[in-house]
Design a protein with these regions (language model features):
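Walker A/P-loop phosphate-binding motif and the immediately C-terminal alpha-helix
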Residues: 150-199, 214, 319, 364
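Cytosolic regulatory regions built on CNB/CRP/Popeye-like sensor folds
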Residues: 1-168, 180, 252
């Protein structure tokens, strides 16, 4: 489907159709519009539009990459590549654009000036009619596939990390993985004759034209830098949409941080760490076990890091998706037993052919996402939770309610037993968890550090277990109460689509007990012995249920969901308690069926961004 189709070159009409206001225009009208357009070259660092200005033209990126920021000198808010429409709303509304737009590298845009558009529209009313029809047609619609390929990289630079050179076969292996999605070409200084006496001047107009021509003929260009800073290395880093640092890891868990190599220093200086990803080759003699990744990350605050394990072709395929802007993610957020709902949702989207490239979670969803990132089957994850919470009765010891309702000692031992003592950076796929930090009042993002800590901090809702106190004295609790959900780190990792799995608690309804009758009701309920059945008659939500409902808020989803993210909020059956762990498997199965039906309905309505990432075979 759309997400797995090979990239192809666009016709003039197709470039114009990336503009929402032109999408439904007849072909004849689009041709008249295209006649008013012209191509414009934009040099790296050149500001195309200043913040606060009314755009005098509409720009469609055909080659290169741009960044938006409040001022040209500020950090980027977003980056946009081929297919992106720049300042579209401000252009049509004749309003100031709130951010500056600057070229990250040498780029080419298709430019339609306002005066030309206005003159054509006045002479041909069908231009305005087509624009209005398009805007009405697209109003409120969620696209089933990316409307543009703004986040898809067209040029990739690969360079050595640490003191080693890039392995000889790396570029070929990466190209093979990319070829399943796009035609690509590998360019190096050797291929350009840079190694010959006299070499080739990279600023020669013929060379510049030839390089641009390669980008137009191939869908992806892989630029292999030299082992040290050279004019070619600098050119490759400047022209790349994505920079991939390649290191060879010896597998040692302990040791000093790996220092930056000269090409890495140049890459960070020219483009910043956010333009870079780190890929680590792992020594085949150490098998598939990954350890010691933090030694590499100490000096490299990269956008993401990836593991290339021996004989794991899928690792190269995943890296290719990240570099091309076609990777996907799964974010699970739910407290207590409601985490089973996120597991059922994952099982449903997996059955539909969707395989996420990265995982994240809060609350019980953090433990579930961690297990999935480790490669566990959803049903095995379900059985693990049942063993910990039902068979081993992790919360069987209540505590005097000074700090929490339950004693955490048994649960802590079971987490240490069933979850690996590993660093999050060593997981085979990108992962993070988010807990709520009571010490700072801010979300605590766990992308590095011990996996067991991330799981324990999120396991049970606040008040039920005491906060987890880490080695720095930070008090951490279940992050499913964070509003809005902390999905921003996932947006930094990938372009999407991302599946956001949540549990939707039903309202409690009106109380069956009058307020003045509460003391008598409480006395009746609390007077029974543990083995006795609850008294017949009206019931009220449990203390745990009230706590959960009071913190069940995510705000307006439009403010935090990405344009391709898909929220699946599974309805929880009325009366299900957040600590009803014996219902875990049943709740997972109910949610699985609900999610399958929901995916089918959304697909039939054309409202399924997820479909863009599902292969056709």
């Amino acid at each position: 489907m759309a997400g797995h189709e090979r990239l192809r070159h666009k016709s003039p009409a197709e470039w114009l159709k990336t503009v929402r206001a032109f999408e439904a225009m007849p072909e004849a009208v689009l041709k008249r519009l295209y006649a008013e357009c012209h191509l414009q070259s934009v040099e790296r660092g050149q500001t195309l539009l200043k913040g606060g200005e009314i755009p005098d033209a509409l720009y469609i990126v055909t080659s290169g990459r741009f960044r938006t920021s409040r001022f040209a000198s500020e950090p980027a808010k977003a980056e946009m590549g081929p297919g992106a429409v720049l300042a579209e709303t401000a252009f049509l509304a004749r309003e100031p654009h709130d951010t500056a737009i600057t070229a990250v590298r040498s780029s080419i845009v298709l430019k339609l000036e306002w005066e030309s558009f206005k003159a054509l529209a006045e002479a041909a009313p069908d231009v305005w009619q087509g624009a209005i029809r398009s805007l009405v047609h697209t109003q409120g619609r969620v696209y089933a596939a990316p409307r543009t390929h703004a986040d898809r990289a067209r040029s990739l630079a690969i360079c050595p990390a640490g003191g080693e050179t890039v392995p000889a076969n790396f570029a070929a292996c990466l190209a093979e993985a990319i070829e399943h999605r796009a035609e690509c070409q590998i360019l190096s200084s050797e291929g350009l004759g840079q190694d010959l006496p006299g070499g080739i001047a990279l600023d020669d107009p013929q060379v510049v034209h030839w390089l641009k021509e390669q980008e137009s003929h191939f869908e992806v260009i892989i630029l292999v830098t030299d082992p040290e800073p050279t004019p070619w290395t600098e050119r490759a880093l400047a022209e790349a949409d994505e920079i991939c640092l390649i290191g060879t890891h010896d597998g040692g868990r302990l040791g000093t941080p790996v220092p930056l190599g000269p090409v890495e220093e140049l890459a960070f200086e020219m483009r910043g760490a956010d333009a870079c990803r780190l890929a680590l080759f792992h020594d085949p003699r150490r098998g598939a076990t990954v350890a010691g990744t933090r030694r590499w990350l100490e000096y490299r605050p990269v956008r993401s890091h990836h593991h290339l394990r021996p004989n794991q072709v899928k690792d190269f395929e995943r890296l290719a998706r990240f570099l091309l802007g076609q990777s996907t993610g799964f974010f699970a957020s739910a407290p207590g037993v409601f985490g089973a709902a996120t597991l059922g949702i994952f099982k449903a989207v997996q059955a539909s052919g969707f395989e996420p490239d990265c995982f994240a979670g809060t609350g019980a969803g953090a433990a579930i996402a961690a297990c999935l990132a480790l490669g566990m089957d959803p049903d095995d994850v379900d059985q693990l939770v049942v063993e910990i919470m039902v068979e081993r009765r992790a919360l069987r010891r209540k505590s005097w309610p000074l700090f929490s309702l339950y004693n955490p000692r048994i649960l802590d031992k079971l987490i240490l037993k069933h979850f690996p003592d590993t660093d999050l950076a060593d997981l085979p796929v990108p992962f993070y968890a988010a807990s709520a930090n009571l010490s700072t009042g801010e979300p605590q993002i766990h992308s590095l550090g011990n996996l067991q800590v991330a799981v324990r901090a999120n396991w049970t809702f606040p008040g039920i277990l005491p906060p987890f106190i880490d080695e720095e004295g930070q008090m951490l609790i279940d992050g499913s109460s964070i509003s809005p959900p902390p999905i921003q780190p996932m947006h930094r990792l990938n372009a999407g689509p991302n599946v956001v799995a949540r549990a939707a608690m039903p309202p409690f309804g009106k109380s069956p007990v009058r307020y003045r009758d509460l003391p008598a009701w409480q006395k009746q309920v609390s007077g029974r012995l543990p083995w006795q059945k609850p008294p017949e008659g009206p019931s009220l939500p449990s203390f745990e249920g009230v706590l959960t409902a009071a913190n069940d808020r995510s705000g307006d989803e439009r403010s935090w969901l990405g344009p391709l993210d898909m929220l699946l909020a599974a309805p929880i059956p009325h009366g299900t308690d957040v600590l009803a762990w014996h219902e875990h498997s049943h709740l997972k199965d109910l949610t699985y069926q609900w999610a399958l039906n929901e995916l089918e309905k959304r697909a039939a309505a054309g409202n399924l961004p997820l479909v863009a990432a599902i292969p056709t075979s």
